[in-house]
Amino acid sequence: MATPTAAAEDRGDRPFWIVNGVVSVLSLSLLAYLLLLRQGAGDKTSLAFMPAVNATFNGASAVLLVLAVAAIKEKKVARHQKLMLAAFASSTFFLVGYLAYHYVHGDTRYPGTGGMRIAYLALLASHVVLSIPVVPMCLAAFYFAFRRKFVTHKKITKLLFPIWLYVSVTGVLVFLMLRSAYG
């Protein structure tokens, strides 16, 4: 049973959970709209460089996440914080670039067939499904770290780290598979 102080603190977190929910739902809704409903502007040359830039941001996020976890295991808190902020910034830049690209281009279909298409679709499906909780979990991890609620922060990050890392790495793999299929 929670102590009165813990219960009061939990109620104090309520505005964060509301904002986190709104931000998460809005970002997922925008992404779903761009990928599933909007057709794109039709100009295939505009922002054609963005998939490579986005893959670079994803790759950077993956490296920064691994370095950040190594830093905290070595009790290098300041380094961990800087690396996590950099990973968050890199993932944020990825998301902005991804949204901009798909706003212009709409959805990108994999042109291959056979086993490669099946492998691509399986990888893409796992990437998409696991990317859904990254934004709200990331916001929660940062929130509880800034509030110095490290027990809660650690519980969230034990789940978040492997998911965020997987999504970052598979984002690069999806790009490479599309790039090789389109030549």
Show which residues each predicted segment covers.
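Alpha-helical membrane insertion/targeting regions
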Residues: 1-183
